[in-house]
């Protein structure tokens, strides 16, 4: 389910490229903005869009791209399925029908859809994209997303030259057979954006992510095609006249990386028309501006947490190793959460665009438990102190900070990724202050985003406690982030009971097509996890997009039938 805001779901990437993936709580948070701009039939012109973070340059979501990369990709490529307002898949470029429920499915893609190099989208492109993920030379994190296809394991291990469960019927149709029945067979399947077989098949799979065809000259099937890329700074796109839904309204789109603290000023000067992935602070500034700026916000699937790297990890083998005992006691983790005034922290840094959460599932998803069923870790520093005292974390030398139960110095090493968001440093400092008020000495460090991701992916020894934000996909299953055997399980949690719940919720023999049975299991999982507390849930947010008064045909609400090709700007 959850996907890092910097790591976008490949299961069904409907990147609403002009909005962040985020989720508000079910209660009224006091912020009521529009979700869309006015309609217009205007044609022509250039739209200037601010990117709040520099792309890494891996412009394919199948190859471990960052969120910034995926935002760029969303302008020139498209997924094969869309989602409705209930976050369920619906036909778009592809349609499907069950041959054998949860075991065999047939997909059909529309005819006449062209890649930017002029070649037609074919079912071979879909099969190629799946084979890339299953190939033994693939170095990304998404093999688990295809390993349940019949024959994928043999292909991955080099025992077969094709995946037996992928059967091409014709140029536009294929049948997929899975090893076993699984409830999320559709939402958990790879539905794009795809890779072009004709364009990329001459590049060795191990070199795809660093190839010029991905980094400098990427192609897609979307309404705009890449004209020029200035690495880490800008992407220029021009309309693709052969786009399958018709000629796009705009002539050009320029994506520019701009420091978040300067975006509103750039919009006031007319240099920027749209700021996606905006923050609450930016929304506040936009509302106080006299430049005719408009704030759009909508519920989405974003939540943030503080994680603990609990075990050693061998990335190459995808094997979890020895436990790291420092934060092994869940009562210590509970004390750390009780010590944080999340309500005050959210109010200070999110300006009404977030709320507290006591779950590892965004409340917008249908599997979300009723908050009343979950432990509520309301701010209670005295309770935190009592827990720490009971555990034996006491100040033995009179310096104001607690030693561990064995009398050794105890310091929390807390990291946050760096970036242009001006709240990163103060919100990290605020967490330090909360913990130190209950006697837990804390060291904080902001780390360059690329290194931060690498350190987490490798479970580096100096990565102990860290901050993350995740953006959910259409599949609500949380296995990607919390199952022991998943590469994206950055906390390296080893909780057999959690794994069993997650496995059972996808076991067709146990739940069939009964969503209530599946939800009941996920609710039990949420109750278990909020008690085990492998991480500290902090907030769930809203998506925010800021536009000037000329932008038209933009709707950021999840499930809207809007394509970028309609997006326009009045002269």
Predicted regions and their residues:
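Extracytoplasmic/peripheral linker and loop segments enriched in polar/acidic and small residues
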Residues: 38, 103, 334, 346, ...
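Aromatic- and charge-enriched surface segment that lines or borders ligand/interaction sites
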Residues: 95-142, 175, 266, 326-327
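Gly/Pro-rich hinge or "lid" segments in bacterial periplasmic/extracellular proteins
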Residues: 184, 189-248, 252, 262, ...
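Long beta-strand-rich cores associated with HINT superfamily self-processing modules
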Residues: 547-571
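N-terminal lobe/hinge region of extracytoplasmic solute-binding protein
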Residues: 50-100, 131, 219
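Append "and occasionally in soluble cytosolic enzymes with long acidic Gly/Pro-rich linkers
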Residues: 326-433, 524
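Surface-exposed binding/hinge segments that line
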Residues: 143-202
């Amino acid at each position: 389910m959850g996907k890092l805001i910097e790591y976008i779901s490949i299961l069904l990437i409907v990147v609403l490229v002009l909005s962040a993936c985020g989720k508000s709580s079910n209660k009224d948070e006091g912020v009521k903005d529009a979700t869309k701009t006015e309609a217009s039939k205007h044609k022509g012109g250039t739209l200037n869009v601010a990117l709040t973070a520099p792309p890494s340059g891996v412009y394919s979501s199948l190859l471990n791209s960052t969120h910034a990369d995926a935002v760029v990709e969303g302008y020139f490529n498209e997924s094969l399925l869309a989602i409705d307002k209930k976050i369920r898949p619906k036909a778009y470029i592809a349609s499907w029908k069950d041959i054998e429920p949860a075991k065999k499915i047939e997909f059909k893609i529309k005819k006449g859809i062209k890649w930017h190099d002029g070649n037609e989208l074919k079912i071979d492109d879909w099969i190629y994209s799946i084979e890339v993920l299953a190939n033994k030379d693939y170095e990304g994190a998404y093999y688990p997303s295809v390993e349940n296809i019949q024959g994928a394991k043999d292909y991955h291990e080099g025992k077969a030259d094709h995946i037996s469960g992928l059967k091409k019927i014709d140029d536009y149709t294929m049948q997929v057979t899975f090893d076993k029945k699984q409830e999320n067979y559709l939402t958990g399947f790879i539905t794009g954006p795809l890779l072009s077989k004709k364009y990329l098949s001459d590049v060795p799979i191990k070199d795809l992510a660093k190839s010029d065809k991905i980094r400098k000259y990427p192609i897609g099937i979307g309404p705009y095609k890449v004209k020029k890329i200035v690495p880490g700074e800008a992407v220029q796109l021009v309309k693709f006249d052969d786009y399958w839904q018709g000629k796009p309204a705009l002539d050009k789109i320029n994506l520019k990386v701009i420091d978040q603290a300067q975006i509103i000023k750039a919009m006031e000067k007319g240099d920027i028309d749209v700021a996606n992935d905006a923050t609450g602070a930016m929304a506040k500034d936009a509302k106080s501006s006299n430049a005719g700026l408009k704030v759009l916000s909508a519920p989405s699937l974003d939540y943030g947490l503080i994680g603990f790297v609990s075990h050693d990890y061998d990335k190459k083998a995808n094997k979890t190793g020895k436990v790291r005992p420092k934060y092994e006691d869940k009562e210590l983790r509970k004390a750390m959460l009780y010590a944080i005034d999340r309500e005050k922290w959210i109010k200070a840094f999110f300006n009404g665009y977030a709320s507290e959460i006591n779950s590892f599932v965004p409340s917008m998803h249908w599997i979300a438990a009723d908050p009343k069923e979950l432990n509520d870790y309301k701010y209670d520093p005295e309770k935190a102190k009592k827990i720490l005292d009971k555990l034996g974390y006491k100040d033995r030398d009179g310096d104001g900070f607690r030693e561990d139960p064995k009398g050794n110095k105890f310091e929390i090493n807390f990291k946050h990724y760096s970036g242009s968001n001006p709240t990163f440093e103060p919100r990290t400092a605020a967490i330090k202050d909360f913990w130190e008020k209950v006697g837990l000495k804390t060291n904080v460090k902001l780390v360059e985003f690329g290194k931060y991701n690498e350190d987490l992916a490798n479970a580096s020894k100096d990565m102990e406690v860290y901050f993350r934000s995740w953006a959910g996909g259409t599949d609500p299953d949380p296995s990607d982030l919390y199952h022991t055997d998943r590469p994206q399980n950055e906390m390296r949690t080893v909780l057999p009971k959690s794994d069993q719940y997650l496995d059972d919720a996808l076991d067709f023999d146990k739940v069939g097509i009964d969503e209530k049975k599946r939800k009941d299991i996920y609710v039990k999982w949420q109750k278990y996890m909020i008690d085990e507390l492998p991480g500290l849930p902090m907030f769930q947010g809203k998506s925010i997009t800021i536009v000037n008064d000329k932008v038209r045909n933009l709707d950021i609400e999840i499930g809207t039938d809007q394509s970028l090709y309609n997006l326009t700007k009045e002269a």
